[in-house]
Amino acid sequence: MGQESKPLIRSTTVLGVIRDGKAALGSDGQMTLGNTVLKHSTRKIRSLYHGRIITGFAGATADAVTLLDRFEEKLDAYGGKLERAAVELARDWRTDKYLRRLEAMLAVVSQDKALIISGTGDVIEPEDSIVAIGSGSMYALAAARSLLKHTPLSAREIVSESLKIAADICIYTNDHIVIEEL
């Protein structure tokens, strides 16, 4: 009769910002299952392609790791060309029956490009060089846009402050923040 009951895993807020040729991507560390916090210090960001690209994930962890592995393969296959690798991953995501069932999103930054690869296989390049995914993404995005527009803060500082704001508002986001920079 109805849908299968599947545990709802909410696990993050990931935010990336590019400013003045420098990129930063960070995430909180909380992983929850339903209304229970499972872990406070989950690492959800990784440096890829010889340290030239940073990616973070939101969604089901096993699904996200599968997508990260596939994305890394695409980066290697296309010589580190971020957009090409993202489009090829999205193409696979849409056409592969196994990948279509994965419940995850990726946020990806290089020094000059920010992309979101959505759970539907879309590649989105935001106009303002800010990427945000996960349960607290809209809070972090709003904070980052304001800080980018009205302060001289660095990309790293904007990511840090914005994730702290999201952690104050979103119950699925904590203040155990990890940030990587390019």
Curated annotation (Swiss-Prot):
Subcellular location: Cytoplasm
SUPFAM superfamilies per the UniProt record, alphabetical: N-terminal nucleophile aminohydrolases (Ntn hydrolases)
Entry GO terms, CC: HslUV protease complex; proteasome core complex
GO biological process: proteolysis involved in protein catabolic process
Chief location: cytoplasm
Active site: residue positions: 12
Transmembrane segments: none
EC identifiers of the protein: 3.4.25.2
Role noted for this protein: Protease subunit of a proteasome-like degradation complex believed to be a general protein degrading machinery.
Protein family: Belongs to the peptidase T1B family. HslV subfamily.
Full protein name: ATP-dependent protease subunit HslV
